[in-house]
């Protein structure tokens, strides 16, 4: 074995059953496991063994040994005896091989050798100093006397007691806590004897060569395996000599024989526990004498046999990739009493042969599907007479699977014969699917029970395995088992291990992608309270004390629905087992004082949610997927003494076992009437068992003790009844996607309010409120998302490649939300593209989600936010004053930030106190600035939601980073630059950020710079460092001078800004920022650069505060420009800015990453009020806000200088005062120097612009604004609007009274940028902040607030489920405060929504953007909309920050959305920007008109998309970063960033700013540019999700990668949807939770799905929502459910959805709504706003559906192709000149044909629209080719063809939906809901 052994070992590890070898290194892995052999060496691990003996360790403590031996010694003795005993043929016989036995006893280390036992001390017990020799002799002595049984039994008791032991290291500890051992611990009570023992006998042979220093090799042979000729070698020491192996083999054989012959004996906890429960556990330690080792030169026959057997075994197990066993230490370090995770890692249970058998067997005959498998396990009675008595009345025939029961009364229990004779009663015979006799091993039970169920689950059906029986019959042991050895593992750990093996095998065989999530819930106590056992380990868990936690809701359609439970992603079996350990530890029965009653009434439901995505080979390529669940239920015995009496009355008391049996029978039978239907346990069982397609297995436990005959009979009878009946299809049964539940079915059945997707959103969803069941908002039973399939269609219907869809199964190391960021990571290279590249929506969502920190990679779901938030919150709260005066805060925020940072002094200038509040580390912007805005958010962020555990740590870092930057200025940031939580773009950003640190400050300074500058809003959605939450979704608002942008469409200005910012680098790397960045592609490019600097700065900021970091980052970028010019390195206003931002939007920042931007805007906002600042109403003020914290520090001079610099470098048409106002407001006014200079700072300006800035500062400003939330919302809206109109109208829309006088859109290149002056003023700024911040983190607050609100409101049942804590969803977290929702409703939010919706329309109601005239743009005044939005926003905030408008109204809530809004401004450069605009337009209008949150982005279900969904058409991804979530951000970011060629697109852009149209166009061109230039940056589609599950989890992510062609620009529809945060409730689809980059999806898909719920691509929810939306405009919220029905965006979506619904496109929902062909449209399409934009005022429902229809699914690749990176495009053109010439003629001809067709289609569309009662020409602009394109160019032709194709599709859709839409149109009155005039911008 030595030589061969090595190979065997290698192979074996997979099998490694026992890793008893305590061999230090080699066997370490195993050693911990194998406590049996654990020798002194093992001791370290030995502790493990102790736990095994669960009692063993503890026993040490008690000196219960014979003659004063401690318990531990007793255990050792028992083990020694057992080992010896097993080697003897019979009780009285002597050891078969005396030499061997002697050797064994001689060398055998004490079974439970204490860790303390070291080689020397090994022999002596530390506790009682008993020498091992004594024990050995005693064992030998006992061996001679066949009393071993009693001895063995006796130890049982001891071991049971042992659990308390703490002596053994982790092992023991686990034992005591022993969830596993303990659970089975019940087993302890159930049966002391074999708690740890495997039911079946197994032999463990430890071979320790004398010369090897005690290294042991343990071979574990299970009896069953022995019989089958299979040997499982847990670990073979490669050094063992063949002789040893031979001896071991001999011993093993002997033992095997014995084992088979002997009845299982409860072994001492020590070693035997690992083995069969009652089964014989043989542990032989074979230690050849020193001489023998050398002496045996050749392997003996036995050795040869053994080796051969091992080799065969190894071959058999080759399939399984062994996990390299971690050092034993790993095992020993379990945090919980049990360590199943360690066991599965080191010694995964060997998979039963039937598990991986032919797939054909996977699908059982239809006949057996409805049947419930019932298995009977007979638990041996304790005592020597057990077998005899058992035989007397119980006969088992395992082969026939029958059990015969005799009446014990008939005869003496001892004599079966006499009894039989005397028995008058006929014996009762019962048949089952399997019968496990007393000596059955645990492994037998597991393999016989789990295999078929697992296959069903992997095949897409639900599965359920539960134990049933009276007390102390081993139910828990069967289900949980013990972690002592692989043989003692129960069904749950085995199921976990095998499920992953099966998934792995299935993945390899079919390419299916899997994602597994785990949830664990317990029903316990007399009150039947429901507990989420994983709440404590849930990354963003808010449940703790403040959250209502998990609850059950009765759904008339879907039955019981479990809501709000934590559903944690488990990429590996070890992780899932870790959650099992955590659940067991959290279970009430594991508590010290747990009494028998508690145990009886404790029922644990452990669920594995399996999401899978398959490539569909048929027809159009696509992916289909579904979710299936495996419920593993450990039912208590329910026999509470009081329970029986109360149970009859149906009281809350525990059900009796018989009552429970009746319930199970009824559920399994599908009976209409279920007894005790209101009992929580019944509801829980219904949720898991009642699914018609659920493969259920029941394991009934009975005792073979005659004394329990009555109980046994009743249990057997019930089990037999269940076995006989066939499951009827219950109408409520299909709660899960399980076999029958299909998307349509589940969705149709499940009321919209039940839509899982939005658990939180739902809570926010106003529509849902009435219908919502108690848990509605959070409702997301695992079954809720049970739609089975999600289909992803490639561009043009082409199949997506597996890689594209699955991302090669491997989660990207880094998922930059913004591709540009990804680019930043040069080292990554092409990989960057992969990072973001998520093959599927689900994957992307997952990743984004992760990034969000929701799940964890990012530092904690919502973790970043949470983490930061928590510190910030703490800090934030301190500055209530700031909070108190939001507006004041606006000005103050900057000051506030100062305190935060070293630059505080400067910052203080504005409002020192707020600054203080802003200090990230101490007080997140919690303080005053955000009180209003933040209050909700704050509540959510700081107080409302508890800091997420994971995120919390990062925030400090962030803070540190922020601070560092503050102090050192740029440098600090560098060092501190946050690293993205998981491989988020943050990393990239980190570097770039560094350089930009100074610049960003500068940028911030210039934030309010000139209106002339274009405002580039860069929303970096990268989890800035730790801020997973922040994800950096920094909305960088940069105002670039047009000139600067113009050059090459690249951020030439940026370059001019300053190398200091490394803007160039940023430009390339930060492109993502660009995405959000500007209306102009140039801006985009510019932004890219700036963002880099910004990001660095931002990173620093991020360090300081998530939101702030974004904001600061933006500001920094802005400042960057200014800063670079102005060497003065303010401590980087990062900190200050942050502070400033924070003050303005610190709460947002704190609460959410987005907040950072918000914070930034906050200053802007303050700036907006900035006029408040005074220096320059717009410019200086803007500047100040831009760098609220830092800049102010810099002081006017710095600002002035920066502003000037920026100005000069970014000469731009100065925006009118409007911009100035807004910017000024934004700027603390700290830089009194002319607003002209710094204000023009692109970032600042942007903020001022209201879009981006508003987004970034919106939050901060919000507080500043009269209504904290409103300003933010407004900002968001403004952003969106801006995007829409391409003007700053959004700013106007922002509540700011001073409407932002929008400067006519600047042209980016040929395109007119819809840049408005920062007129938005502070109102706008806040809005922008909202958008930006909202994107990041603000949203969480809102969301949270919303969610809770929704939770309360939505649940119509009145049985208000406990207010569901907002799930971890980043968004939600970001919007954490429950209060946020109300705030969200704040005008700011509403305003923002309105702005988005109103598209540039100054919403009088909001801030009366009196200042903004929409003059320059064609923005329609959407004042009324603002109001509506406002109103809507309130609701919307409840939603998912669905629309930008929504988000703005939500303020923080709009984190995702806000970014969208942010992009709005930078739409041209970044689709997202446009997206927000269109969304704004349509969404805003809707939002305003109707409370729906239709605002663009409203649909974006994911925050990431922020407005992405609403932005749908406008490449959400453009700023995915806009997406409030960094997760989404990265996606969008990449897409937007890639648009390096904005200039190209811009060129084509129309000179005229049609307002929304232009924005759309810009977005479109932006998309093209992205494809052209952005793609490269992206590295193709570098959308890896940083935190994809394992490969499985990554799930399908329609990859941006799919269009890796060229630049892999994000599809025009690309929008990054913020990952939905199912938050604590299972989302039906993994994708549901993941963020989606709509662009990633095929055009059609992307557009449709994205539009519908651009970020929500859970196929299910979104579908469902869509259908609901279809129902009516008012139903929009429902349809928005997914994203947050309440949000305007949602509304918008719902409007769209009507069409979908009519179409029956429920499924489509998964897919991003197809956006109008961005390519075809040129830029316009890219803007989600495009479609939303076009018909903003339109009745939400009508236009939205249309838009959906309109969306043509552009071929992403095509888009990419026609839109090479701007830089690329020119080159391409040059290179292809000759080709073009050659093709010119042909092209011209084709062009004429296409134009003719296009014209014809336009006419048809107009006619159809008339029938649909839509405004004629409503979407036409979507189908127009970007004017920037050369009509002669192939690109133009391609774009035209795409546009035509999209138009054709739109026409067809419209025609197909004429009737349906017409119906909805009739109720379009929804628009009436929008107060104020509704205008359609097209």
From Swiss-Prot:
Binding residues annotated for ATP, in chain numbering: 469-476
Comp. bias (Pro residues): 948-957
Reported tissue expression: In the developing cerebral cortex, preferentially expressed by migrating excitatory neurons.
Signal peptide boundaries: none
Coiled coil location: 1784-1812
Gene Ontology terms for molecular function: ATP binding; microtubule binding
InterPro entries hit by this protein: Kinesin-like_fam, Kinesin_motor_dom, Kinesin_motor_dom_sf, P-loop_NTPase
Comp. bias intervals (Basic and acidic residues): 1397-1412
Occurrences of domain Kinesin motor (ranges): 371-725
Gene Ontology BP terms: cerebral cortex development; enteric nervous system development; negative regulation of signal transduction; regulation of cell growth by extracellular stimulus; regulation of neuron migration; regulation of neuron projection development
PROSITE patterns named in the record: KINESIN_MOTOR_2 (PS50067)
Region (Disordered): 1-66, 149-201, 316-337, 729-785, 851-915, 940-993, 1121-1237, 1335-1728
Bias type Gly residues, positions: 54-66, 856-865, 1495-1505
Ranges of Low complexity composition bias in the record: 165-187, 732-741, 1135-1152, 1532-1546, 1672-1685
Positions of modified residues (Phosphoserine): 31, 885, 1262, 1662
Family annotation (CDD domains): KISc
UniProt biased composition (Polar residues): 899-910, 1624-1637
Cellular-component GO terms for this entry: cytosol; microtubule
Source species, domain of life: Eukaryota
The keyword Nucleotide-binding is assigned to this record: yes
Homology family: Belongs to the TRAFAC class myosin-kinesin ATPase superfamily. Kinesin family. KIF26 subfamily.
Disease: Cortical dysplasia, complex, with other brain malformations 11: An autosomal recessive disorder of aberrant neuronal migration during brain development. CDCBM11 is characterized by dilated ventricles and reduced white matter, and is associated with axonal developmental defects.
Chain's role: Atypical kinesin that plays a key role in enteric neuron development. Acts by repressing a cell growth signaling pathway in the enteric nervous system development, possibly via its interaction with GRB2 that prevents GRB2-binding to SHC, thereby attenating the GDNF-Ret signaling. Binds to microtubules but lacks microtubule-based motility due to the absence of ATPase activity. Plays a critical role in cerebral cortical development. It probably acts as a microtubule stabilizer that regulates neurite growth and radial migration of cortical excitatory neurons.
Subunit and partners: Interacts with GRB2 (via SH2 domain).
Protein name per its UniProtKB record: Kinesin-like protein KIF26A
Organism: Homo sapiens (Human)
Gene behind the chain: KIF26A
């Amino acid at each position: 074995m030595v030589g061969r052994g090595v190979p065997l070992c290698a192979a074996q590890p997979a099998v490694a059953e026992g890793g008893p070898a305590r061999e230090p290194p080699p066997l370490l892995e195993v050693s911990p496991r194998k406590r049996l052999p654990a020798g002194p060496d093992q001791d370290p691990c030995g502790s493990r063994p102790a736990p095994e003996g669960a009692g063993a360790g503890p026993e040490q403590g008690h000196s219960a040994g014979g003659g004063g031996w401690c318990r531990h010694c007793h255990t050792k003795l028992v083990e020694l005896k057992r080992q010896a005993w097993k080697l003897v043929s019979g009780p009285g016989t002597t050891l078969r091989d005396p030499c061997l036995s002697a050797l064994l006893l001689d060398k055998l280390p004490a079974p439970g050798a204490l860790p303390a036992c070291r080689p020397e001390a090994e022999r002596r017990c530390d506790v009682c100093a008993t020498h091992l020799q004594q024990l050995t002799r005693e064992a030998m002595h006992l061996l001679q006397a066949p009393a071993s049984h009693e001895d063995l039994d006796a130890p049982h008791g001891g071991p049971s007691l042992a659990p308390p032991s703490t002596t053994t290291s982790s092992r023991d500890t686990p034992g005591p806590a022993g969830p596993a051992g303990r659970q089975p611990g019940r087993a302890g009570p159930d049966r002391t004897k074999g708690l740890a023992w495997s039911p079946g006998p197994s032999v463990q042979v430890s071979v320790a060569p004398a010369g090897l220093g005690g290294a042991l090799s343990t071979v574990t042979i299970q009896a069953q395996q022995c019989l089958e000729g299979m040997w499982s070698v847990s670990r073979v020491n490669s050094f063992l000599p063949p002789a040893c192996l031979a001896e071991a083999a001999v011993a093993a054989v002997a033992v095997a024989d014995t084992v088979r012959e002997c009845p299982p004996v409860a072994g001492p906890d020590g070693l035997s526990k690992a083995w069969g429960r009652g089964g014989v556990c043989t542990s032989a330690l074979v230690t050849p004498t020193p001489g023998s080792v050398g002496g045996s030169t050749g392997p003996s026959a036995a050795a040869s046999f053994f080796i051969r057997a091992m080799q065969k075994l190894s071959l058999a197990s080759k399939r399984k990739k062994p996990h390299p066993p971690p050092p034993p230490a790993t095992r020993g370090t379990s945090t919980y009493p049990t360590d199943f995770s360690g066991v599965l890692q080191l010694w995964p249970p060997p998979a039963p042969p039937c598990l991986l058998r032919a797939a054909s067997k996977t699908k059982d005959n239809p006949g057996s599907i409805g049947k419930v498998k019932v298995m009977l396990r007979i638990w041996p009675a304790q005592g020597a007479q057990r077998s005899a008595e058992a035989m007397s009345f119980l006969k088992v025939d395992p082969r026939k699977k029958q059990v015969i029961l005799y009446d014990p009364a008939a005869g003496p229990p001892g004599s079966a014969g006499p009894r039989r004779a005397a028995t008058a009663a006929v014996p009762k015979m019962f048949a089952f699917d399997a019968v496990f006799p007393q000596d059955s091993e645990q492994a037998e039970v597991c393999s016989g029970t789990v295999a078929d169920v697992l296959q069903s689950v992997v095949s897409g059906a639900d599965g359920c395995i539960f134990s049933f029986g009276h007390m102390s019959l081993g139910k828990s042991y069967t289900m949980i088992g013990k972690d002592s050895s692989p043989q003692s593992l129960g069904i749950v750990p085995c199921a976990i291990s095998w499920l992953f093996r099966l998934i792995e095998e299935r993945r390899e065989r079919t390419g299916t992608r899997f994602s597994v999530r785990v949830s664990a819930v317990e029903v316990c106590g007399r009150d039947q309270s429901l507990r989420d056992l994983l709440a404590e380990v849930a990354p963003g868990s808010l449940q703790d004390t403040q959250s209502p936690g998990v609850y059950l809701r009765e759904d008339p359609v879907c039955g019981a629905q479990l809501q709000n439970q934590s559903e944690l992603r488990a990429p590996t079996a070890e992780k899932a087992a870790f959650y099992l350990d955590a659940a067991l530890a959290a279970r009430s029965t594991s508590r010290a004082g747990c009494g028998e009653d508690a145990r009886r009434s404790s029922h644990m439901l452990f669920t594995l949610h399996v999401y899978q995505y398959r490539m569909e080979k048929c027809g159009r390529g696509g992916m289909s997927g579904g979710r299936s669940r495996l419920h593993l239920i450990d039912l208590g015995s329910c026999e509470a003494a009081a329970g029986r009496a109360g149970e009859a009355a149906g009281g809350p008391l525990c059900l009796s076992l018989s009552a429970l049996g009746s319930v199970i029978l009824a559920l399994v039978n599908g009976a209409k009437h279920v007894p005790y239907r209101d009992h929580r346990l019944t509801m829980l069982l219904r949720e898991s068992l009642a699914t018609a397609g659920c493969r259920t297995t029941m394991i009934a436990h009975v005792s073979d003790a005659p004394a329990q005959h009555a109980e046994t009979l009743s249990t057997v009878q019930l089990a037999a009844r269940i076995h006989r009946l066939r499951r009827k299809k219950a109408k409520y049964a299909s709660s899960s996607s399980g076999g029958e539940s299909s998307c349509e079915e589940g969705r149709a059945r499940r009321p919209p309010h039940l839509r899982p997707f939005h658990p939180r959103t739902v809570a926010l969803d106003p529509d849902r409120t009435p219908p919502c069941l108690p848990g509605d908002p959070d409702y997301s039973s695992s079954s809720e998302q049970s739609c089975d399939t999600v289909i992803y269609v490639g561009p043009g219907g082409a199949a997506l490649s597996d890689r594209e869809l699955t991302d090669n199964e491997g989660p990207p190391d880094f998922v930059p939300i913004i591709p540009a960021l990804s680019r930043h990571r040069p080292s990554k290279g092409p990989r960057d593209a992969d990072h973001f590249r998520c093959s599927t929506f689900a994957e992307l969502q997952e990743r984004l989600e992760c990034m969000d920190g929701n799940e964890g990679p990012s530092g904690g779901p919502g973790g970043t936010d949470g983490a930061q938030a928590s510190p910030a919150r703490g800090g934030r709260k301190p500055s209530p004053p700031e909070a108190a005066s939001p507006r004041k805060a606006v000005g103050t925020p900057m000051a506030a930030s100062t305190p935060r940072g070293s630059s505080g002094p400067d910052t203080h200038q504005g409002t020192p106190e707020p600054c203080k509040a802003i200090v990230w580390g101490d007080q997140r912007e919690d303080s005053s600035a955000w009180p209003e805005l933040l209050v909700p958010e704050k509540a959510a962020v700081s107080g409302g939601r508890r800091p997420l555990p994971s995120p919390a740590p990062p925030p400090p870092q962030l803070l540190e980073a922020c601070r560092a930057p503050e102090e050192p200025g740029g440098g600090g940031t560098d060092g501190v630059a946050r690293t993205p939580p998981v491989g988020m773009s943050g990393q990239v950003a980190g570097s770039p950020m560094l350089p930009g640190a100074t610049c960003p400050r500068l940028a911030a300074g210039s934030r309010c710079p000139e209106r002339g500058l274009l405002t580039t809003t860069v929303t970096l959605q990268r989890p800035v460092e730790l801020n997973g939450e922040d994800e950096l979704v920094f909305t960088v608002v940069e105002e670039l001078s047009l000139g600067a942008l113009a050059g090459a469409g690249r951020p030439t200005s940026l370059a001019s800004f300053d190398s200091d910012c490394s803007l160039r680098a940023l430009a390339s790397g930060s492109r993502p920022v660009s995405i959000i960045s500007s209306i102009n592609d140039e801006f985009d490019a510019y932004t890219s650069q700036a963002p880099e600097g910004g990001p660095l700065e931002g990173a620093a900021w991020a360090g300081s505060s998530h939101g702030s970091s974004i904001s600061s980052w933006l500001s920094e970028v802005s400042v960057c420009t200014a800063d670079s010019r102005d060497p003065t390195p303010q401590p980087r206003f990062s900190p200050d800015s942050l502070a400033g931002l924070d003050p303005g939007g610190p709460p947002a920042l704190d609460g959410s990453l987005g907040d950072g931007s918000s914070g930034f805007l906050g200053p802007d906002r303050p700036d907006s009020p900035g006029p408040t600042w005074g220096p320059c109403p717009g410019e200086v003020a803007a500047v100040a806000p831009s760098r609220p914290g830092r800049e102010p520090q810099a002081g006017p001079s710095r600002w002035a200088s920066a502003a000037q610099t920026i100005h000069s470098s970014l000469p731009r048409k100065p925006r009118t005062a409007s911009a100035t106002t807004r910017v000024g407001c934004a700027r603390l006014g700290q830089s009194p120097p002319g607003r002209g200079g710094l204000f023009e700072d692109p970032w600042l300006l942007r903020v001022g612009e209201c879009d981006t800035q508003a987004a970034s500062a919106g939050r901060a400003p919000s507080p500043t604004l009269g209504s904290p939330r409103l300003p933010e919302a407004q900002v968001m809206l403004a952003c969106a609007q801006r995007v829409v109109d391409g003007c700053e109208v959004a700013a106007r829309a922002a509540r700011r009274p001073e409407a932002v006088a929008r400067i006519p859109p600047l042209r980016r290149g040929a395109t007119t940028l819809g840049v408005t002056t920062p007129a938005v003023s502070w109102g706008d700024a806040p809005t922008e902040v909202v958008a930006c911040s909202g994107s990041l983190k603000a949203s969480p607050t809102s969301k949270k607030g919303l969610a809770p609100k929704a939770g309360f409101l939505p649940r119509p049942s009145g049985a208000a489920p406990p207010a569901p804590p907002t799930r971890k969803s980043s968004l939600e977290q970001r919007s954490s405060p429950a209060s946020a929702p109300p705030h969200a409703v704040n005008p700011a939010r509403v305003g923002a929504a309105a702005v988005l919706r109103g598209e540039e329309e100054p919403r009088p109601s909001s801030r009366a953007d009196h200042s903004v005239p929409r003059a320059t743009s064609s923005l329609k005044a959407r004042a009324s909309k603002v109001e509506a939005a406002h109103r809507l926003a309130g609701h919307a905030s409840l939603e998912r920050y669905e629309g930008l408008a929504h988000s703005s109204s939500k303020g923080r809530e709009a984190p995702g959305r806000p970014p969208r809004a942010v992009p709005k401004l930078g739409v041209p450069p970044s689709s997202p920007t446009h997206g927000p605009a269109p969304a704004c337009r349509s969404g805003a209008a809707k939002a305003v008109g109707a409370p729906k949150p239709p605002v663009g982005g409203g649909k974006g279900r994911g925050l990431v998309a922020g407005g992405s969904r609403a932005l749908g058409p406008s490449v959400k991804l453009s700023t995915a970063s806009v997406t409030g979530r960094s997760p989404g951000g990265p996606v969008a970011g990449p897409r937007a960033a890639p648009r390096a060629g904005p200039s190209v697109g811009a060129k084509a852009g129309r000179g005229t700013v049609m307002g929304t149209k232009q924005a759309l166009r810009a977005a479109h061109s932006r998309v093209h540019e992205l494809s052209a230039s952005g793609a490269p940056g992206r590295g193709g589609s570098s959308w890896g999700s940083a935190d994809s599950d394992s490969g499985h989890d990554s799930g399908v992510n329609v990859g941006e990668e799919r269009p890796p062609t060229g630049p892999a620009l994000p599809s025009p529809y690309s929008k990054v949807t913020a990952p939905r945060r199912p938050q604590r409730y299972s989302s039906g689809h993994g994708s549901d939770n993941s963020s989606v980059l709509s662009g990633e999806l095929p055009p059609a898909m992307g557009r449709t799905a994205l539009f519908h719920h651009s970020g929500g691509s859970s196929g299910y929810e979104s579908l469902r929502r869509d259908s609901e939306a279809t129902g009516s405009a008012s139903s929009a919220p429902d349809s928005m459910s997914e994203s947050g029905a309440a949000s305007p965006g949602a509304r918008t979506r719902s409007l769209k959805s009507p069409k979908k619904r009519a179409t029956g496109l429920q499924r489509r929902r998964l897919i991003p709504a197809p956006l109008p062909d961005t390519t075809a449209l040129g830029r316009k399409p890219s803007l989600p706003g495009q479609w939303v934009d076009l018909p903003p005022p339109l009745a939400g429902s009508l236009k939205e559906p249309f838009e959906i229809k309109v969306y043509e699914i552009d071929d992403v690749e095509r888009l990419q192709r026609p839109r090479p990176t701007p830089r690329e495009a020119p080159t391409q053109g040059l290179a292809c000149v000759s080709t073009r010439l050659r093709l010119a003629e042909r092209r011209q001809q084709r062009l004429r044909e296409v134009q003719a067709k296009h014209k014809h289609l336009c006419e048809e569309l107009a006619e159809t629209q008339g029938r649909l009662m839509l405004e004629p020409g409503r979407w036409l602009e979507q189908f127009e080719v970007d004017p920037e394109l050369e009509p002669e160019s192939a690109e133009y032709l391609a774009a035209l063809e795409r546009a035509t194709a999209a138009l054709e599709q739109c026409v067809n859709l419209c025609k197909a939906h004429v009737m349906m839409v017409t119906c909805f149109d009739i109720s379009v009155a929804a628009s009436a809901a929008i107060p104020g005039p509704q205008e359609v911008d097209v």
